[in-house]
Each structure stands twice: as structure tokens, then as C-alpha cells.
A protein has these predicted regions:
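Sec-dependent bacterial lipoprotein signal peptides
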Residues: 1-19
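Bacterial lipoprotein signal-peptidase II cleavage site
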Residues: 20-26
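Post-signal peptide N-terminal segment of mature Sec-exported envelope proteins
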Residues: 27-50
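Short beta-strands within extracellular/lumenal beta-sheet-rich domains
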Residues: 46-69
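A short beta-strand element within beta-rich, extracytoplasmic domains
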Residues: 70-88, 165-169
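Short, surface-exposed beta-strand/strand-loop-strand elements in extracellular ectodomains
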Residues: 87-105
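Solvent-exposed serine/threonine-rich low-complexity stretches and specific carbohydrate-binding patches
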Residues: 107-120
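Cysteine-clustered segments with highest specificity for TGF-beta superfamily mature ligands
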Residues: 117-165
Length: 178
């Protein structure tokens, strides 16, 4: 009986060690939330005339809602932006913002930026893969709600549309053991 008990304890210990050292991995399709509200597309004009917005309305993404009992180890974001240029030659910068306070989304530094050189009548596809967001942004993804904003800026006299075609966040969480 004692041998079976020791075997069971050893098997459970091995299983626990093999589970990734207390890590959980979550994959959030941020694009699906943005597409559902038609916030995946943003026109751009350069130079920007007065009164023309360069941002989408802030969008709500349901996140993990784990709270402070865990630590975010890694937040990898990847996807693709298409710059559908109708006129002019220049560069478009597509910036993505995250925050847990809706009113603060556009007040900070963007989480990441994607650039694309554009020419008239051509769609420029710009894939991106950000291996890990800045440390200051990682705790945001433990909240139950994360707000997302998108801004475009341009150089040159150009016009067109920036269309997000994919945006995923892969979040690696580690339990706190202290």
C-alpha cells in the first residue's frame, strides 16, 4: 500500500512539473472584437485637415480577468495591416494603444506601431510580430476589460485607408508563489 501511495505522489509531482511550471497561455483574437464593431478600418489623410479624426472610438475587449494573483510573463502581439492608398506617396504609421481606463487610452505611449510606405493605387501589406510588449503594459492584460485604440499618422500628401486584417495577443501568465 505504501508503495502505491509513493508511486501516486511521484506521478502527481511529475505531472505538476510537466504542466509548464505554473504557466497558462491565452490567445485572444483582438481583431474579432474590432471587426465586430467596424473599428478595424481607419481612413488616413495627410496632412490631416482640422476636424478629421485620426483615431477610432475606443473599443472594449474582454480579457482574462485574473486579477493580481498572477504575473504576466509575456504579451506577444502579431497580425497584419493593409494600407490601401488612393493618392500620393508617403508613409503611414498605424499605432495601437491599450489601457484599463477608457479615458486614458490615447494619453500614453502606443503599445506598438506599424509603418508602411505607400504609393498611389497600391495596397501595402505590413505584417507585424511584437515578441513582447513593454513591461509597464503587461499587467493590463490581467484585468477583465482592456480598452483598445488605433491611431494613424502620415508623412506626405496622401490619402487612403488603413485596414487591420489580423491582430492576436498571446499572453503567458505565471502564478505568484510568494
Amino acid at each position: 500500500m505504501r508503495g502505491k501511495w509513493l508511486f501516486l505522489v511521484a506521478a502527481l509531482t511529475a505531472a505538476a512539473i510537466g504542466c509548464g511550471q505554473g504557466r497558462a497561455i491565452f490567445d485572444i483574437d483582438v481583431f474579432s472584437f474590432l471587426r465586430a464593431t467596424n473599428a478595424d478600418t481607419l481612413p488616413y489623410v495627410g496632412p490631416l485637415p482640422p476636424g478629421v479624426p485620426d483615431t477610432i472610438p475606443v473599443q472594449t475587449i474582454k480579457s482574462l480577468g485574473i486579477g493580481s494573483s498572477s504575473i504576466v510573463d509575456t504579451v506577444r502581439v502579431f497580425g497584419t495591416v493593409d494600407f490601401v492608398n488612393t493618392s500620393g506617396t508617403g508613409t503611414v504609421t498605424f499605432q495601437v494603444y491599450f489601457d484599463t481606463a477608457k479615458s486614458a487610452v490615447y494619453t500614453g505611449t502606443p503599445a506598438f506601431s506599424v509603418n508602411g510606405a505607400v504609393t498611389p493605387g497600391v495596397t501595402t501589406t505590413s505584417p507585424f510580430d511584437i515578441p513582447d510588449l513593454p513591461t509597464a503594459l503587461k499587467p493590463l492584460f490581467l484585468a477583465s476589460t482592456v480598452y483598445v485604440g488605433i491611431r494613424v499618422s502620415t508623412t506626405g500628401t496622401i490619402s487612403g485607408t488603413a485596414k487591420l486584417t489580423a491582430l492576436r495577443a498571446r499572453i503567458v501568465i505565471q502564478d505568484k508563489f510568494f
